[in-house]
Amino acid sequence: MLTKFETKSARVKGLSFHPKRPWILTSLHNGVIQL
């Protein structure tokens, strides 16, 4: 399963990759956390 995820943000504060699944966790400077 391939899913395209897109969001507009000026800056990303943190980025983390899941070791076994194709997931990316991002924390944005506006306080939003997205998986």
UniProtKB/Swiss-Prot annotation:
Tissue spec: Gastric, duodenal and jejunal mucosa. Circulates in the blood. Seems to be confined to specific endocrine cells.
Alphabetized UniProt keyword annotations: Hormone
Residues spanning the membrane: none
Highest taxon in the source lineage: Eukaryota
InterPro entries in the cross-refs: WD40/YVTN_repeat-like_dom_sf (IPR015943)
GO molecular function, one term: hormone activity
Keyword Nuclease: no
Subunit and partners: Oligomeric complex that consists of at least the alpha, beta, beta', gamma, delta, epsilon and zeta subunits. Interacts with SCYL1. Interacts with JAGN1. Interacts with TMEM41B. Interacts with SVEP1. Probably interacts with PEX11A.
Role, per record: Xenin stimulates exocrine pancreatic secretion. It inhibits pentagastrin-stimulated secretion of acid, to induce exocrine pancreatic secretion and to affect small and large intestinal motility. In the gut, xenin interacts with the neurotensin receptor.
Name of this protein: Coatomer subunit alpha
Organism whose genome encodes this protein: Canis lupus familiaris (Dog)
